Amino acid sequence: MELPRLYAITDRKKYGENFLETLEKILKKGVRMVQLREKDLKDRELYKLAKEVRALTKKYKALLLINERFDIALAVEADGVHLPEQSFPPSVVKRVNPNFIVGFSAHSLESAKYAEKEGADFITLSPIFKTSSHPEAQPIGLKTLKEVSEKVNIPVYALGGITWEKIKVCYKNGAYGIAGISMFLE
């Protein structure tokens, strides 16, 4: 399966009061892969929101991945999960559901290679640039993006401080796609 090039990551605090309306605007712009990443929600709240997001992503024929919560992903019939770097290995997900798309958050060449070896379908590599989402994180830069993109055989999504003006330079440095939170709100 060919993955979409744009990957939106949700953030209720940045989306504002009309979460689903904001997400629908993003989908109307052509984004076809969404990660529901709302770590602060309790199980029942996350499940309820995930069901609503699943209905919306189906309407736009977009893929839905749930951040780390394999149980919620199964319950709402999402297309897969996105695993943080310190989460369980992608191979565990693939063993339970071989059809699930598994994304993995990598922050170095080492973790990108680990993700590939463990069966991840793609990685997000971050932060490429300084980002408001994680102001304490040191940017890894375009050189690392290029190196990782050349040394792994799975799609690499550039993430972190990406603006519409920086997309082209990310693609020039090997990015398969672009992931982000704020950029899709512009």
From Swiss-Prot:
2-[(2R,5Z)-2-carboxy-4-methylthiazol-5(2H)-ylidene]ethyl phosphate binds at residues 131-133, 161, 181-182. It is an enzyme of class 2 (transferase). GO terms for cellular component: cytoplasm. Pathway: Cofactor biosynthesis; thiamine diphosphate biosynthesis; thiamine phosphate from 4-amino-2-methyl-5-diphosphomethylpyrimidine and 4-methyl-5-(2-phosphoethyl)-thiazole: step 1/1. It catalyses: 2-[(2R,5Z)-2-carboxy-4-methylthiazol-5(2H)-ylidene]ethyl phosphate + 4-amino-2-methyl-5-(diphosphooxymethyl)pyrimidine + 2 H(+) = thiamine phosphate + CO2 + diphosphate; 2-(2-carboxy-4-methylthiazol-5-yl)ethyl phosphate + 4-amino-2-methyl-5-(diphosphooxymethyl)pyrimidine + 2 H(+) = thiamine phosphate + CO2 + diphosphate; 4-methyl-5-(2-phosphooxyethyl)-thiazole + 4-amino-2-methyl-5-(diphosphooxymethyl)pyrimidine + H(+) = thiamine phosphate + diphosphate. InterPro entries: Aldolase_TIM (IPR013785), ThiamineP_synth_sf (IPR036206), ThiamineP_synth_TenI (IPR022998), TMP_synthase (IPR034291). One of its GO terms (molecular function) is magnesium ion binding. One of its GO terms (biological process) is thiamine diphosphate biosynthetic process. Its EC number is 2.5.1.3. Its cofactor is Mg(2+). 4-amino-2-methyl-5-(diphosphooxymethyl)pyrimidine binds at residues 35-39, 67, 105, 134. It holds the Pfam family TMP-TENI. Keywords: Magnesium, Metal-binding, Thiamine biosynthesis, Transferase. Binds 1 Mg(2+) ion per subunit. Mg(2+) binds at residue 68. Condenses 4-methyl-5-(beta-hydroxyethyl)thiazole monophosphate (THZ-P) and 2-methyl-4-amino-5-hydroxymethyl pyrimidine pyrophosphate (HMP-PP) to form thiamine monophosphate (TMP). Belongs to the thiamine-phosphate synthase family. NCBIfam families: thiE. This is Putative thiamine-phosphate synthase 2. It comes from Aquifex aeolicus (strain VF5). The lineage of its organism: Bacteria, Pseudomonadati, Aquificota, Aquificia, Aquificales.
